[in-house]
Amino acid sequence: QLQEFAIQKRNISSFIRKIQQYAQYNKKIYTLDFKISEKMAYFLDNVKGKKEIIDKLKISDNLSYMTNNSNKNADFLRNTTNEGNFEKGFSIYLLDKKGEKIYYRISTNTINAAKYPIISIYRAKTPIKLNEDYLKASLWEEEI
């Protein structure tokens, strides 16, 4: 399972970065459609009012995922700005397959003054149970 976490955190963070770079380079708004329900992430372009898939990423069935959105297990959309940032930050948590313990967090921070998001990967110092306060900074360490 450790290898699965390594692969997924790399794949998801690279996918987010790819969308950000396209937006920055093309000066255009794109959409990340993260479908936890389908274990898929989509990179969408808005062409004449229709969403067209530029790329997609299958996320592993061997892990569980949640977000920092109000409905933690719901699918979500994030648009980029045409400068390459996201309209709003988000975090994706990587959990064991049963969805009982959190191991990693991929955070996309848009609050900084820069035009681009900061994409960071944090590792739980020890796996965090869902009923713990997993937002406490002391439970996490940033990976380089």
Labelled PLM ranges:
Residues 3, 7, 21, 25, ...:
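N-terminal helix-rich module
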